[in-house]
Amino acid sequence: MLDHVLLLTYCLVSTVVRSQPSADVFRSFAGYIPEDHRVTHHEWQNSGKFQGDIDGVDPNLLKLPEGPVLFNALKNKQLTWEGGVIPYEMDTAFSPNEIKILEKAFDSYRRTTCIRFEKREGQTDYLNIVKGYGCYSQVGRTGGKQEISLGRGCFFHEIIVHELMHSVGFWHEHSRADRDDHIKINWDNILPGMKSQFDKISAVLQDLQGENYDYKSIMHYDSTAFSRNGRNTIETVENGFTQVIGTAMDLSPLDIVKINKLYSCKTKKKEKVKPATTEEPHQLIPQVVDKNSVDSGEKCVDHFADCPHFAQYCTRASFFFVMKSYCPFTCKHCPGDRKLKKSG
């Protein structure tokens, strides 16, 4: 219930005109945030699909020691999109604001990979983006009119980027054949009838591309996915990352590397990406800004005195834009600010 209230409140707040923040709206938003609540999006769990949001899959075939590579675009290059161009058509039911959020997700791929989402111009194979029930997609290019659903509760940047990455050709990170070396599944905490959502995909069907397991992947389940009691269903083997998995707001550095490998993208940078599992977890701590360092002629100030109290939400996916708009000083979103540093 709390997740739904938070979601509704976020949607309301995010549409407020930024030039004149509403004290009532902000206080309403802030009042719903408990001190220890880690916000996650579970709308995709309600789609009734394989692993919550994957459409067009027979789970039994995926678990066979040998089977048709048809179901995994990573293993079968024939199921990738030619030239990295993904044609799409969009449901007319989407609002202008929803379209804007969707286009921003497209842009995440354009800026970091050779993937291009382009409006369909008669192509046979294309994405049909609809306002269906729940959030779900198919993996890779399955042929013809291919549905991707972004229903109620799905219009968050990170959710859309996640679903689009399925379409690009990727499974969930937790379903990797080598996942037991990196995470522990707490089977007793999983909802009845939902244990199959944590099945591994056979190595025969899945190409790991020689890349490390990525706790920070946009494709990772969060720690309480399909939980029957609010306790962790997934815990990381490496200390400090249980609260990191499933909280990505965008493509991780390794997500980008994997996409560019799959599509043989020509990248401008030759830098080697540091494996996500060797980094220290980010600490969600209040950020301090020197007002004198602001380059803009305008003063960068918080709009409410309570902002420092909610500093931990500056980097939470669900509240990022709200906090940026209402608490720019606390959240270090002033012109000229240095990037958020990790503690320690």
Swiss-Prot record:
Q: Which residues form a coiled coil?
A: none
Protein name (database record): Zinc metalloproteinase nas-6
Q: Which Pfam families match?
A: Astacin, ShK
- Residues annotated as binding Zn(2+) are 162, 166, 172
Signal peptide (from-to): 1-19
EC number(s) reported in the record: 3.4.24.-
Mind listing the UniProt keywords for this protein, alphabetically?
Disulfide bond, Hydrolase, Metal-binding, Metalloprotease, Protease, Secreted, Signal, Zinc, Zymogen
What does this protein do, in the record's words? Metalloprotease.
One GO biological process term is:
nematode pharyngeal pumping
The segment(s) forming the Peptidase M12A domain are: 72-266
The record's listing under SUPFAM superfamilies reads: Metalloproteases ('zincins'), catalytic domain (SSF55486)
Q: Name one GO molecular function term.
A: zinc ion binding
Q: List the disulfide bonds.
A: 114-265, 135-154, 300-334, 307-327, 314-331
The UniProt entry, under InterPro entries, shows:
Astacin-like_dom (IPR034035), MetalloPept_cat_dom_sf (IPR024079), Peptidase_M12A (IPR001506), Peptidase_Metallo (IPR006026), ShKT_dom (IPR003582)
What happens without the gene?
10 percent of animals are arrested at the larval stage. Defects in the grinder of the pharynx result in reduced pharyngeal pumping rates and a slower growth. In a nas-7 (hd116) mutant background, growth is further reduced.
Cofactors needed by this protein, per the record, are: Zn(2+)
Give the originating organism. Caenorhabditis elegans
Q: Which gene encodes it?
A: nas-6
Enzyme class name: hydrolase
Q: In which tissues is it expressed?
A: Expressed in pharyngeal and body wall muscles, intestine, hypodermis and pharyngeal mc2 cells.
GO CC, any one term: extracellular region
Name where it's found. Answer: Secreted
Q: Where is the ShKT domain?
A: 300-334
Q: Write out the catalytic residues in the record.
A: 163
Relay the cofactor remark from the entry: Binds 1 zinc ion per subunit.
